[in-house]
Amino acid sequence: MAKKYFGTDGVRGEVGQFPITPDFVLKLGYAAGQVLVQHDTDQKPTVLIGKDTRISGYMLEAALVAGFTAAGVNVVQTGPLPTPGVAYLTRALRLSAGVMISASHNAYSDNGIKFFAEGGVKLSDEVELEIEAKIDGEMKTLPSARLGRARRISGADDRYIEFCKSTFPSHSDLRGLKLVIDTANGAGYGVAPKVFHELGAQVVSIGDEPNGYNINEKCGATYTKTLQAAVLQHEADYGIALDGDGDRLMMVDKNGKVYDGDSLIYVIAKARAREGINIGGVVGTVMTNMAMEIALKEQGVDFCRAKVGDRYVLAQLNQRSWLIGGEASGHILCMDKHNTGDGIISALQVLAALQTLNQDLATVCADWQPYPQTMINVRIQKGQKWQEASKDVLAEVEKELEGKGRVVLRASGTEPVVRVMVEARQADWARDGAERIASAIGSL
């Protein structure tokens, strides 16, 4: 059954526009609370609510609290905390569920609601459908004796900081390193600098003055120019950029070069292989560069591709019992450290890997150079049979690029566009292949 409200990462949209309105979020909290009560009949469920730094977080948090407590669920509120921190505390405190109020890397004018089940794992499709089935039902407030309570928890930041530090090798530290930390004026502003400082690094913090409106604004993992300039200005060893909710990571070296998720995953995987740790393999996506796949296999590390989206990477990791995966966008999963993507923990794993390899980031990543890519968006008409139109040309290009490149065709889920991506060892091969396929699709 198709979901009506939940997308690939919870419920998200522009604040004030359905479904990110106080009345809908009230109903969402109430419906989720009803499902929790049904699943946890032995005791009154407790849910943890965290948020990022958007001005709308206050409004949406109040609506969620009202909905949960009206359904008979207790609520624990953390205030601003990264999404992976909410997942961790949900597990550590043995709570029934966790909720994060955030729109991740989007502008402050958007917001969203993301749920975690018991144990800090993402909700299953089945539970999301259960919640959706109740959203449009009538709200009936329970008798006062059965209502839930709400309270703010103290020390949530400190618990999460200690957890992050525990994922770094106990025999090592970060003394001697100068790091610039860009927290995107987001959820990690109060915790990320402390993690690296307490492990011994000299820390310069930027993007750490949220005002409700400046989250992700010319800062963070989706805008690295500010971090690159700061690394050069402060003559730092590395720069670390998170996104608004702290689950993405980009890094910058001392020369101002940016390293995306693919490069950082390679560093972690190579170090684990060098240490003889069996990670099973690495899960990337259909957009992961082919050169990285080849480089991993040269290190003896298996590789497979999932659909784009960290939930699909996570599903493949769980299915295969592998430990490392992620996307070029900076979602990195280290399953032996945390059960969700975590920008802070991923950065710590990269820094630990560089110590293991006794090399800097540029040297390790020189093992492979990304194959050139050509991407073309082709507009199509509703109902257009673009697969049939491109079938013969696609087969020709794939045969020509066998072992030397690959083709990815993706229909956009939000606009009438087919995205043609061709990558190959040589840029002209990629460009020629993409143009031929795009021409075939657009010829109808």
UniProtKB/Swiss-Prot annotation:
Signal peptide: none
GO cellular component: cytosol
Cofactor(s) recorded in Swiss-Prot or TrEMBL: Mg(2+)
Keyword Phosphoprotein: yes
Cofactor note: Binds 1 Mg(2+) ion per subunit.
Modified residues (Phosphoserine): 104
GO BP terms: carbohydrate metabolic process; peptidoglycan biosynthetic process; UDP-N-acetylglucosamine biosynthetic process
Residue intervals passing through the bilayer: none
Residues annotated to bind Mg(2+): 104, 243, 245, 247
Catalytic residues, chain numbering: 104
Keyword set includes Cell cycle: no
Gene Ontology MF term list: magnesium ion binding; phosphoglucosamine mutase activity; phosphomannomutase activity
Entry EC no(s): 5.4.2.10
Catalytic activity: alpha-D-glucosamine 1-phosphate = D-glucosamine 6-phosphate
Keyword tags: Isomerase, Magnesium, Metal-binding, Phosphoprotein
Post-translational modification: Activated by phosphorylation.
Similarity section: Belongs to the phosphohexose mutase family.
Function: Catalyzes the conversion of glucosamine-6-phosphate to glucosamine-1-phosphate.
The protein, known as: Phosphoglucosamine mutase
Organism of this sequence: Neisseria meningitidis serogroup C / serotype 2a (strain ATCC 700532 / DSM 15464 / FAM18)
